[in-house]
């Protein structure tokens, strides 16, 4: 699909395995349109819940933001948040003991360590980190702060024994001289054993399903 990738269609593709931009005929963002909602009902979250996995959408939200974001027919929530809601998962408030703020941390190493601890309680913990994207659009001169923040978070997560899968729905922070998204390939990092990696966003869901099925077989979970 020609044009620059956008989060609404890109995240939907990542979470569902469906080329959402091709379905709509254009890239769309930042939030998925109502036309994409049926796809999100069959997302990674829905599959993991159906498989009996213990699942956490760890992002923390301000209650006043959630009230405004869910007021009308068009939800001003990311594909991750919409998928979590459609799978019956709560969107956690900032003060919830399981919640992680999605960036701008005072102690990024400590937040990473907490995230690693959560992975010992849940089979799958999802955290949507959007601080790099926000700064790339609005204040690119401050991007080095966010890269340092993310580095410290990852260090805390890995040093506390977390198994990491890191990817993105589009590029932009890697080209700080302009505020637009890019056509560059996005990273896909996984620290565990895995089959050959997917070639594009639509391959991420089936790839993750193979990994999770291998790690958490139903027969093993019921013994």
Language model features with spans:
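Short glycine/threonine-rich loop-to-helix capping motif typified by GTGT followed
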Residues: 140-141, 175-180
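Short, hydrophobic alpha-helical segments
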Residues: 158, 208-216
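Substrate-binding rim/cap in mid-to-C-terminal beta-strand-loop elements of soluble/periplasmic
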Residues: 180-211
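Intrinsic disorder/low-complexity segments enriched in small, polar and charged residues
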Residues: 214, 222-223
